[in-house]
């Protein structure tokens, strides 16, 4: 097994939101993940967490986050233990504080995917072990590591990249893209209707990070100016988990913000890549997709099937990179 080369001394540190790290630390984790990806491809052992036990707490369902944390843990030599919403009592029969103190006695690290940012913050405060945010309503830092790793793999650099996010500007992905991009020197544009712009608290954090690291953040409802010269176009579902009652309203607001061939052409570039954190409503091959078609007559929502499957799309590289970047976070903070 090769000796571990950590980007920075992050041992014992939690990752609850992007700006828990410096920009240099954040990109260092991306570079570390790229090294671990090579180890995986080469079959080089990298069991840096041999004998460690990892708790995977899930209030929300998951495909990529659960799979990524599970495989990453096993590859690193650790044992992952899944605790779903029916297994844990967070704030119901037992306080988050008490739960955290118990889990901290038994596990070496804790992942949490759920609703409240306060919950993951309390887990970190009271457990005494590193805690990693697998998604909350406010932030999605492990997704950002994978997203910006995918961009760096494609272009070779991050500083100066033009990234345009199109769609609902009031979700965790939009918040995190702004802040992480600003920390990495990326020019981030959030293209969204005026009624869905990011709240000031998140925008102001992003602006502060941009002033520190040389990135930029802009918000607009003008699709033409937002996507011009974009190296990356990113979108997400129009309705997040728990917002299903908003479908009709969001379709009305966001139908013109669909990522399609016309939008890609507006970039003026031939090498623009398309990203999506998944799952995506790009066809009718799911129960949701069929239901949306029956109710609204739509066969595609935030992205057309053509673009999703096109040479521009990097969505499955992006999904794979969840595992490599999560592995980097765990190894750097526990190894």
UniProtKB/Swiss-Prot annotation:
Protein name: Ornithine carbamoyltransferase 2, catabolic
Annotated function: Reversibly catalyzes the transfer of the carbamoyl group from carbamoyl phosphate (CP) to the N(epsilon) atom of ornithine (ORN) to produce L-citrulline.
Intrachain S-S bonds: none
Database matches in NCBIfam families: orni_carb_tr, PRK00779.1
Known EC number: 2.1.3.3
Species of origin: Staphylococcus epidermidis (strain ATCC 12228 / FDA PCI 1200)
The keyword Cytoplasm is assigned to this record: yes
Pathway listed: Amino-acid degradation; L-arginine degradation via ADI pathway; carbamoyl phosphate from L-arginine: step 2/2
PROSITE patterns in UniProt: CARBAMOYLTRANSFERASE (PS00097)
Reactions performed catalytically: carbamoyl phosphate + L-ornithine = L-citrulline + phosphate + H(+)
GO MF annotation: an example: amino acid binding
Top-level taxon of the source organism: Bacteria
Family: Belongs to the aspartate/ornithine carbamoyltransferase superfamily. OTCase family.
């Amino acid at each position: 097994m090769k000796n571990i080369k950590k980007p920075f001394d992050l041992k014992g540190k939690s990752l609850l939101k992007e700006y828990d790290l410096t920009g240099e630390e954040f990109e260092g984790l991306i570079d570390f993940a790229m090294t671990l990806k090579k180890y995986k491809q080469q079959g080089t052992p990298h069991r840096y967490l041999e004998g460690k036990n990892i708790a995977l707490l899930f209030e929300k369902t998951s495909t990529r986050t659960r799979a990524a944390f599970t495989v990453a843990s096993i590859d690193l030599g650790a044992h992952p233990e899944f605790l779903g919403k029916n297994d844990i009592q967070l704030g119901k029969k037992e306080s988050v504080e008490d739960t955290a103190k118990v889990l901290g006695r038994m596990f070496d690290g804790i992942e949490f995917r759920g609703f409240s940012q306060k919950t993951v913050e309390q887990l970190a405060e009271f457990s005494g072990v590193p805690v990693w945010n697998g998604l909350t309503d406010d932030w999605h830092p492990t997704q950002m590591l994978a997203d910006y790793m995918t961009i760096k793999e494609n272009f070779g650099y991050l500083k100066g990249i033009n990234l345009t996010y199109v769609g609902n500007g009031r979700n965790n992905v939009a918040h995190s893209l702004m802040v992480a991009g600003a920390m990495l020197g990326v020019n981030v544009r959030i293209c969204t209707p005026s009624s869905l712009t990011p709240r000031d608290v998140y925008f102001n954090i992003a602006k502060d990070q941009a002033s520190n690291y040389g990135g930029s953040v802009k918000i607009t409802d003008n699709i033409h100016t937002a996507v011009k010269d974009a190296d990356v176009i990113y979108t997400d579902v129009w309705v997040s988990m728990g917002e299903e009652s908003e479908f009709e309203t969001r379709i009305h607001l966001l139908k013109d913000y669909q990522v399609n061939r016309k939008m890609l052409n507006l970039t003026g570039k031939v090498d623009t890549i398309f990203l999506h954190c998944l799952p995506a409503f790009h066809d009718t091959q799911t129960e949701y997709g069929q239901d949306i078609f029956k109710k609204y007559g739509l066969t595609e929502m935030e992205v057309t099937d053509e673009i999703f499957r096109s040479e521009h799309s990097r969505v499955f590289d992006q999904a794979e990179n969840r595992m490599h970047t999560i592995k980097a976070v765990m190894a750097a903070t526990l190894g």
